[in-house]
Curated annotation (Swiss-Prot):
Organism from which the protein derives: Anopheles gambiae
Matches recorded under InterPro entries: Mab-21-like_nuc_Trfase, Mab-21_HhH/H2TH-like, MAB21L/cGLR
Protein name: Protein mab-21-like
PANTHER family assigned: CELL FATE DETERMINING PROTEIN MAB21-RELATED, PROTEIN MAB-21-RELATED
Family from the record: Belongs to the mab-21 family.
């Protein structure tokens, strides 16, 4: 098919602008965050080392491998989460009956005695391993570790929360979340995935993702509020970070996500924090389903993919609902006020309109 020369010229200019933006803005942001991560991980590792001395069941899993830290997630340029993987989940059954969307419980297997578990004192009378009890014990240990660690002058435990959050240099916040890694199993609540008759992801990639599994996190969540208080405290949140990252390999998918995060930092830090990196990552996964061919994720398509994701985001903000990729009954906007979401949709539309109507938009962004 012949393509008009002016269309080729416009596309070439757009590719040039996006590549320039990636080099001058995105990579600079990534470099700055990498420097911050190196500093804060050194401090967090020291705190976790002290925790392990006090309580050997909490073994630090924050290790650097091929330039990245396992279990570390960047929430924003100043907020981070470290997932601390615990050992010996084996004597518990994973119960995912749908009564707690986005969460599950760990119940002592039939015929197993409490004494067979490494976590015996955190098992409830009903035989559930309590996420809240484990987090409470971990909170106490971290508070003591902060007082003893060599960096105590620059790190503090954030008060008035059951979460374990460290404030470092009065600027960075690091949440440390106890978790279990569940490999080789897949939650029933995500059994519908992948949707039939959609060519992406490839069956081999699906098998890889399901083998990778998911994590169970001990943390507070708006999705559990209003449920039975005991069940809420005992429940563990489903977390699919590694599965999501695996799906985003290939083509310019990860580059799209890096550009989206940079645009978010520079233009979408709004009152009430309606939009976070995870919303953008979720919508990127939906965009992958809409555009399943690898040719739709090359350099020439990046602008179209970004616009598609922003238009999806506007729709979600206006409908006041953003479904989780693996658990669509879970609304990622839950707890956000309509006013905050409406304001965000206007900001996203301005950003999207600029990208759609100006070939030089990325010079200004």
């Amino acid at each position: 098919m012949l393509v008009p020369q002016d269309m080729v010229t416009v596309q070439s200019k757009t590719i040039f602008q996006i590549n320039k933006y990636y080099a001058e803005k995105v990579q600079v942001r990534m470099g700055n965050i990498a420097l911050v991560l190196r500093e804060i991980c050194k401090i967090v590792q020291e705190v976790l080392r002290e925790v392990e001395v006090q309580e050997p069941r909490f073994i630090s899993s924050l290790v650097e491998c091929n330039g990245r830290y396992e279990g570390l997630e960047v929430i924003s340029p100043t907020a981070f989460e470290v997932v601390l993987y615990l050992n010996q989940m084996g004597v518990f059954n994973f119960v995912d009956d749908g009564s707690l969307p986005g969460a599950a419980v760990l119940k002592l297997s039939d015929g197993r005695k409490r004494s067979m578990s490494l976590w015996v004192e955190f098992i409830t009378a009903s035989g559930y391993l309590s996420a809240r009890k484990i987090r409470s014990r971990f909170h106490t240990l971290v508070a003591q570790a902060v007082e003893k660690c060599p960096y105590r002058d620059m790190v503090k435990l954030v008060p008035d929360t059951t979460e374990v959050k460290l404030r470092i240099r009065e600027r960075y916040t690091v949440q440390i979340t106890p978790a279990f890694k569940c490999t080789g199993i897949w939650p029933r609540s995500a059994a519908h995935w992948p949707i039939l008759n959609i060519p992406w992801p490839h069956p081999a990639l699906v098998a890889e993702v399901k083998t990778e599994g998911f994590d169970l996190l001990s943390k507070e969540s708006v999705i559990l509020q209003g449920k039975n208080a005991n069940v809420e405290g005992d429940a563990w949140l489903l977390h699919f970070t590694e599965a999501e990252n695996r799906l985003l390999q290939g083509g310019y998918r990860k580059r799209c996500l890096s550009i989206l995060k940079t645009l978010c930092d520079r233009h979408l830090e709004l009152p009430g924090v309606p939009i976070g990196y995870y919303h953008l990552k979720t919508l990127l996964l939906y965009e992958c389903e809409k555009h399943p061919r690898e040719t739709e994720w090359d350099a020439g398509c990046v602008a179209d993919r970004l616009n598609g994701i922003f238009l999806q985001l506007i729709s979600c903000l206006q409908c006041r609902r953003c479904p989780h990729y693996f658990l669509p009954s879970l609304d990622l906007f839950k707890g956000k006020s309509p006013t905050v979401l409406d304001n965000a949709s206007k900001h996203v539309w301005r950003l999207c309109r600029d990208i759609l109507t100006s070939s030089k938009a990325f010079d200004r962004l």
